[in-house]
């Protein structure tokens, strides 16, 4: 099986840590970076977490799906159908915004590790970020206001749902990694 390899320069930096990304100005700074990314030329591939969820579920079913996941995964099709409506305006996304992929160099935030990048609903990106950083309602409102210019309850609902999808997908990824 052929592997793709990309080598880049080493960036001397420190990990941002999820607590640092809770600060209001850091949320605004990160949103500025994301809006630049989301406004860039489309990537050559799309990213759909549901594709990964089904893939990971199939791997896990071979050894028995963890019982704790069964009730959640029984509803994943319904959630996917509801969110499919929003997959029409895809933008370039990172799709894996855990704290380890957000670093600080010379007091500047940088996003690294684009192996799951692809075109996606920007609300998935914001939902993924909000879950990984464990944002509370106030911080999610700050995120939405910074990104969209206003608080919109429909957008907040989409971000929260996409955060659940992200959490399910990356949790399944963790289960798969633990089995290997």
Question: Where do the language-model regions lie?
Answer:
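Short, intrinsically disordered, charge-balanced linker/junction segments flanking boundaries
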Residues: 1, 179-180
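ATP-binding pocket architecture of kinase catalytic cores
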Residues: 1-48, 58-59, 63-71, 85
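A general structural signal marking secondary-structure boundaries and capping sites
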Residues: 34-45, 83, 133, 151, ...
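An alpha-helical support segment within catalytic cores of ATP-dependent transferases
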Residues: 42-95, 105, 151-153
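Active-site acidic catalytic loop and adjacent metal/ATP-binding pocket
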Residues: 78-124, 138
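Active-site activation/catalytic loop segments of kinase-like enzymes and analogous catalytic loops
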Residues: 123-151, 164-179
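Start-of-helix signal in alpha-solenoid helical-repeat scaffolds, especially tetratricopeptide repeats
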Residues: 157, 161-164
């Amino acid at each position: 099986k052929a592997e793709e390899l990309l080598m880049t320069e080493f960036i001397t930096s420190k990990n941002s840590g999820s607590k640092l990304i809770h600060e209001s100005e850091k949320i605004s700074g990160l949103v500025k970076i994301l809006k630049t990314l989301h406004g860039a030329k489309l990537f050559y591939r799309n990213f759909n977490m549901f594709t990964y969820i089904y893939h990971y579920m199939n791997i896990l079913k071979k050894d028995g799906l963890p019982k704790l996941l069964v009730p959640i995964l029984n509803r994943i099709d319904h959630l996917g159908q509801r969110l499919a409506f929003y997959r029409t305006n895809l933008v370039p996304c990172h799709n894996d915004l855990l704290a380890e992929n957000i670093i600080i160099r010379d007091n500047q935030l940088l996003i690294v590790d684009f192996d799951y990048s692809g075109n996606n609903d920007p609300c998935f990106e914001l939902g993924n970020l909000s879950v990984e950083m464990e944002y509370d309602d106030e911080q999610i409102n700050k995120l939405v206001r910074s990104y969209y210019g206003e608080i919109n309850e429909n957008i907040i609902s989409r971000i929260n749902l996409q955060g659940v999808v992200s959490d399910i997908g990356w949790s399944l990824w963790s289960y798969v990694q633990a089995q290997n």
